[in-house]
Design a protein with these regions (language model features):
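Helix-to-loop junction immediately C-terminal to a conserved catalytic motif
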Residues: 50
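The feature captures the beta-strand-to-loop junction immediately N-terminal to the Walker
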Residues: 35-37
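Walker A/P-loop
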Residues: 43
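Conserved beta-strand
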Residues: 4-7, 14-30, 63
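Conserved ABC transporter NBD signature motif
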Residues: 58-72
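ABC-family P-loop ATPase nucleotide-binding domains
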Residues: 10-13, 69-71, 76-130
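ATP-binding Walker
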Residues: 40
Length: 130
């Protein structure tokens, strides 16, 4: 279970408050959506939930975050120059978790996401995807 209680996030540079008193919990299998205008802290919230060290340079935060055995992942919105030159297959191969799945399981996941398998095994570079 992922449980967040009384989360407050404040930007260090201008003291702008992104969240105040934010509380929620997710059980295994639950789904959630974070919707908001650009620049209002959606990515900051996700980074903080994944690893608070990712945001410590630019925000102050308080509250509690309990992951209780949940495995979280975070995929940055921007690729490094090296990642941009990789194919989708090369990019995925970097993550040890990738090797825990059979080709059939990967194909099923790609199908659910609407991701054509030829994109995965083709020569198209990561930087060309939107």
């Amino acid at each position: 279970m992922l449980q967040v209680q009384g989360l407050q996030i404040v930007m260090k540079k201008d003291l702008r408050q992104l969240l105040q008193g934010f509380t929620f919990s997710l059980q295994p299998g639950d789904k959630a959506a974070i919707i908001g205008e650009e620049g209002n802290g959606k990515s900051t919230l996700l980074k903080l939930l994944y690893d608070p060290a990712l945001v410590e340079e630019y925000v102050e935060w308080s509250g509690t975050v309990q992951k209780d055995g949940m495995i979280l992942g975070y995929l940055s919105q921007e690729l490094t120059p090296q990642e941009g030159e990789m194919t989708a297959y090369e990019f995925c191969c970097q993550d040890p978790a990738f090797w825990e799945y059979t080709p059939g399981e990967l194909a099923e996941a790609a199908k659910k996401l609407g991701f054509p398998m030829e994109w995965f095994y083709g020569d198209r570079k990561m930087k060309s995807f939107s």
